[in-house]
């Protein structure tokens, strides 16, 4: 812990030019670019309309309703999420509820088709 405190003190005493040189050295050593991260972070703030046009990359698969085949839907929810029988049943009966969050578009479409085949009504958000 004392080493970290010393490191913080050393970094705090750097001039702006020394800090910029340090950033460049770390970028080279780690093979990353801090400039790209800054550009990405600044992008949405600059143009809200451009962000709206961008295609969504992460989706939440939401179970809107179980439909008539509730048992089949519970089985599919268990297979997808790894939940136990009671937890999957509670999720299905408590619809609308998210089944899986932060999934890629192709996986979300696959899960939607799988659950709809079992009889569920699914929304992608």
From Swiss-Prot:
Highest taxon above the source species: Bacteria
UniProt GO molecular function: mRNA binding; structural constituent of ribosome
Any Pfam family hit: Ribosomal_L12_N
Gene3D superfamilies named in the record: 3.30.1390.10, Single helix bin
Keywords associated with the record: Ribonucleoprotein, Ribosomal protein
GO-annotated cellular components: cytosolic large ribosomal subunit
Biological processes annotated in GO: translation
Statement: the UniProt record of this protein carries the keyword Transferase: no
InterPro entries listed in its UniProt record: Ribosomal_bL12, Ribosomal_bL12_C, Ribosomal_bL12_C/ClpS-like, Ribosomal_bL12_oligo, Ribosomal_bL12_oligo_N_sf
Keyword Ribonucleoprotein among record annotations: yes
Summary of the function given for this chain in its UniProt record: Forms part of the ribosomal stalk which helps the ribosome interact with GTP-bound translation factors. Is thus essential for accurate translation.
Self-association and partners: Homodimer. Part of the ribosomal stalk of the 50S ribosomal subunit. Forms a multimeric L10(L12)X complex, where L10 forms an elongated spine to which 2 to 4 L12 dimers bind in a sequential fashion. Binds GTP-bound translation factors.
NCBIfam families: L12
Family listed: Belongs to the bacterial ribosomal protein bL12 family.
PANTHER family: 39S RIBOSOMAL PROTEIN L12, LARGE RIBOSOMAL SUBUNIT PROTEIN BL12M
Name of the protein in question: Large ribosomal subunit protein bL12
Organism: Methylobacterium radiotolerans (strain ATCC 27329 / DSM 1819 / JCM 2831 / NBRC 15690 / NCIMB 10815 / 0-1)
Lineage: Bacteria, Pseudomonadati, Pseudomonadota, Alphaproteobacteria, Hyphomicrobiales
Gene (UniProt): rplL
